[in-house]
A protein has these predicted regions:
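Non-transmembrane, aqueous-exposed alpha-helical and coiled segments at domain scale
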Residues: 1-427
Length: 427
């Protein structure tokens, strides 16, 4: 069976933990989109890790981890991540990298940095990982596929073409030194040597695995609201964040995806710019940020303080719908145990009218949150294993959210560890 783990909101929902947990019973874990611009935090017996490109199955010796064709592949970072976990006592993971994946080049990162600098106060809040320039090149058909690293004549011709294309912009718009074909060839040769042991036709591998009845877990990055088509455009990422894209980014038939686990926090958080209707500020936000996550709410990639807010039923209902959700995993519920009452955003007021439908960005910028307040439970719920053992007000909070988003909450995370999970109403 193929199942996907994806995000309902702006990313940072806790997908890494849920993937790590579900991976125990999987044979293969696949990253199918995005790059090193977001991190998945995992806490296990080896310690606490922030993975940026490696699939979250790397901590299990029985799993084959696949980086699919849809990923923005930063080869030095992948190799560094592998070495980083091995240095901390994790056995070397089984890893396959698609021969059709495309490569994040050093000039993609340079262009990303230069453009953010040029835009100044109107920037997109990029992590400066080269993602937008990478995908721009991919769809302009001037990117480098992994398979091309092994064809020297093709590389020699292509690097000259890249220099001719990029240098006018570098020199005249950004006032930076020109690229040289020699330097680009040297960079590509170093990438070839690094990636060679892992390269495979991963689409064929996955096709055969599915045919044999293997359990495949597709691991998404970011969340529905960062999708370039359906999210808070233009403050979005550059690849689709939806489970449906898993078929494309991994190279498997769409009808094989039987289960979609959509992860949502019990409150809201976001990194980067863009509309965030239930956002809170000041001491209220600082307190939630300090208590949140595992060691505070700070970006796994940038270390930036995350923007904080209360749970948003409007955004989460929309995000779950887009993902084709079969199950919701509700995370970091334990964080809210300090509150006397908990506000939940149940609607948006736009131009004097209240809606429960998620609008396009122009209207979203004008939206004001409509809150209902629920009583808190004022205790620590870590260590609880059964739903019935949760405090009554905690159960009421879960059931209130479930009713408003319209999708079943079947997993509740009440701590950072693998074992901190409560299963509920699973089919």
């Amino acid at each position: 069976m193929v199942q996907a783990v994806v995000g309902a909101n702006w990313g940072d929902e806790g997908k890494g933990k849920i993937t790590d947990m579900l991976a125990e019973k999987a044979d293969i874990v696949v990253r199918f989109q995005g790059g090193a611009n977001a991190g998945h935090t995992i806490v296990n017996n080896y310690g606490k890790f922030a993975l940026h490109t490696l699939p979250s199955g790397v901590f299990y010796s029985h799993i084959t981890n696949v980086i699919g064709n849809g990923v923005a592949l930063n080869i030095p970072l992948v190799v560094k991540e592998v070495q980083g976990i091995v240095d901390r006592g994790v056995p070397a993971p089984k890893l396959l990298i698609s021969d059709r994946a495309q490569i994040v080049m050093s000039y993609h990162i340079l262009f990303d940095q230069c453009e953010e600098e040029r835009l100044g106060g109107k920037s997109f809040g990029s992590t400066k990982s080269g993602i937008a320039p990478f995908y721009a090149d991919k769809f302009s058909k001037v990117g480098f596929q992994v398979s091309e690293l092994f064809h020297e004549e093709l590389l020699a011709e292509k690097v000259q073409r890249i220099c001719d294309l990029k240098n006018p912009i570098l020199e005249h718009l950004y006032h930076k030194p020109a690229l040289t074909p020699e330097a680009l060839l040297e960079e590509l040769h170093s990438y070839r040597d690094m990636v060679k042991p892992f390269v495979a036709d991963t689409a064929a591998f996955l096709y055969n695995a599915v045919k044999e009845g293997k359990s495949v877990l597709l691991e998404g990055q970011l969340g529905s609201l960062k999708d370039p088509d359906h999210g808070i455009y233009p403050m979005v990422t550059s690849s689709s964040t939806l489970a449906g894209y898993g078929a494309i980014g991994a190279g498997i038939p769409p009808y094989e995806i039987k289960r979609v686990v959509t992860v949502s926090k019990a409150y809201s958080s976001a990194v980067g710019a863009g509309a965030f209707v239930s956002e809170i500020f000041g001491d209220e936000a600082d307190e939630l940020r300090r208590r949140g996550g595992d060691g505070g709410e700070f970006g796994a990639t940038t270390g930036r303080p995350r923007r904080m807010g209360w749970f948003d039923c409007v955004a989460s209902k929309y995000g779950c719908r887009l993902q084709g959700t079969t199950d919701v995993a509700f995370t970091v519920l334990d964080v809210l145990g300090y509150l006397d009452e908990i506000p939940v955003c149940v609607g948006y007021e736009i131009d004097g009218e209240v809606t429960t439908d998620f609008p396009t960005t122009a209207l979203l910028e004008k939206a004001k949150p409509v809150y209902e307040k629920l009583p808190g439970w004022k205790c620590d719920i870590r260590g609880i294993k059964k739903y019935e053992e949760l405090p009554e007000n905690c159960r009421k909070y879960i059931e209130f959210v479930e009713k408003h988003i319209g999708f079943p909450i079947t997993m509740i995370s009440n701590g950072p560890g693998r074992e901190d999970i409560i299963y509920r109403n699973e089919k």
